[in-house]
Amino acid sequence: MASPALISETEAWKDLKSHLEGIKKTHLRELMGDTERCQSMMVEFDNIFLDYSRQQASPDTISKLYKLADEAHLKQKIDRMYNGDHINSTENRSVLHVALRASRNSAISSDGKNVVPDVWNVLDKIKDFSDRARNGSWVGATGKELKDVIAVGIGGSFLGPLFVHTALQTDPEASKNARGRELRFLANVDPIDVARNISGLNPETTLVVVVSKTFTTAETMLNARTLREWISSALGPSAVAKHMVAVSTNLPLVEKFGIDPNNAFAFWDWVGGRYSVCSAVGVLPLSLQYGFAVVEKFLQGAHSIDQHFSSAPFEKNIPVLLGLLSVWNVSFLGYPARAILPYSQALEKLAPHIQQVSMESNGKGVSIDGLPLPFESGEIDFGEPGTNGQHSFYQLIHQGRVIPCDFIGVVKSQQPVYLKGEVVNNHDELMSNFFAQPDALAYGKTPEQLKKENVSEHLIPHKTFTGNRPSLSILLPTLDAYRIGQLLAIYEHRVAVQGFVWGINSFDQWGVELGKSLATQVRKQLHASRVKGEPVEEGFNFSTKTLLTRYLEATSDVPADPSTLLPNI
């Protein structure tokens, strides 16, 4: 008998639907009272501790989710990814970001070729170049050391590396290696972003890394041309070859741009942008800032989770458990969002990165076979470090919409502070909130409890917390390069699990194309209006025509053929 075309047509899905009503009637207060249940919902790998006992789920729920995974052929799909099968079917590509952090002696194939040697050729090239840039044997056009780096890219070429950079900045080993150096990321085509990035920097000591696989990405290449002008206007056109390098596979365009093709670092079609932080996209700028040895530890951390994900049984497999719980929360309990709440300021850029990884991967309305999905899939991801988020949006999480939460804590702070006479140290104060918030969400506070506290009758409705709000807790032992790599890989694989179960293609992103193609039409109109004085006429609806006309009239002082003007800040 043929497999159902949609996962929602399977017996396991229908069984979970039937099971749902009983779970909805059971409060987390009751579920949390079962010690045996709680103990069964705790998993540890390599000192990473996952507690998902505060999910609206019983052991029976979890068993049924395993059956759903089996009917979705989850293990086979994971194996197909690792084997280099073209699981990105709409673009006919392998999905092999795991190869980017594989050990040198590994064998991972795409189209019959072991890609690991190519990966390590690029890593060795990055190590050599970053070592030379850091020790002063590669210098700028005027002989000065290149201590400042601007990485130019957008989307996955920016969010992932920025997350890792921000997390490493306060790590003792990494920060020591980065002393006297600066790494910035230019992503937005907004000239304000250019101004902020070059502010306070000297072209003589700045190296620009242009990240674009095809070297045609509109925003990235305009920003790259802007920085090329910034360098050449200060140091002369010949300086570009000393101050700009590329992460790209289009060597002819790299050379035409003025960058020496020998200073281009490759990556491959089997690397999706949002999964590219472990390629030259992230490894090159991060190695220039922190040294290759630190970044290699980051890669090793990601690799450790890759091995865990591919080999651990589902009951002990952290990414699989997280992915299945997300499917349960989204498609069965009907919760559309997820809050990512790291209790570490070093992880402040985790949520924006995972927002892209998750929402660009799983924000799909059709199955991998093109069938409309009759169920909800994908999550709205957002987050903020604790305790800042508590003073921002936790109000809604506690007393408004139900939003499942990921609490991420770190046992040992990167930068401990101790003050004599304080009741607890700064990190203990932070972690007090990490431990308290999940219970507040789960248990809530009843009107009866408030009455016992002599709360005024008219305030009781306002101070009541319904509880029964699901969360999970991840406790990391430390936050060094290795653990940052592990955390990244956990979330990458969690997202893949969700997509595999939902039966969607988590590795394409056709949704970004339509807006870009329409922007081409607008760009042509802006050029025609500025240069030829043509009014906004054909091809636009009334609303867009009105907005465009208003914009052009208000910026009529912009010259048709302006002289070069760079930000002055």
From Swiss-Prot:
Keywords: Cytoplasm, Gluconeogenesis, Glycolysis, Isomerase. The active site is at E360 (proton donor), H391, K516. GO terms for molecular function: carbohydrate derivative binding; glucose-6-phosphate isomerase activity; monosaccharide binding. Its EC number is 5.3.1.9. It holds the Pfam family PGI. It is found in: Cytoplasm. One of its GO terms (biological process) is glucose 6-phosphate metabolic process. Pathway: Carbohydrate degradation; glycolysis; D-glyceraldehyde 3-phosphate and glycerone phosphate from D-glucose: step 2/4. PROSITE patterns: P_GLUCOSE_ISOMERASE_1, P_GLUCOSE_ISOMERASE_2, P_GLUCOSE_ISOMERASE_3. Its main location: cytoplasm. It catalyses: alpha-D-glucose 6-phosphate = beta-D-fructose 6-phosphate. One of its GO terms (cellular component) is cytosol. InterPro entries: G6P_Isomerase, G6P_Isomerase_C, Phosphoglucose_isomerase_CS, SIS_dom_sf, SIS_PGI_1, SIS_PGI_2. Homodimer. NCBIfam families: PRK00179.1. Belongs to the GPI family. This is Glucose-6-phosphate isomerase, cytosolic 1. The lineage of its organism: Eukaryota, Viridiplantae, Streptophyta, Embryophyta, Tracheophyta.
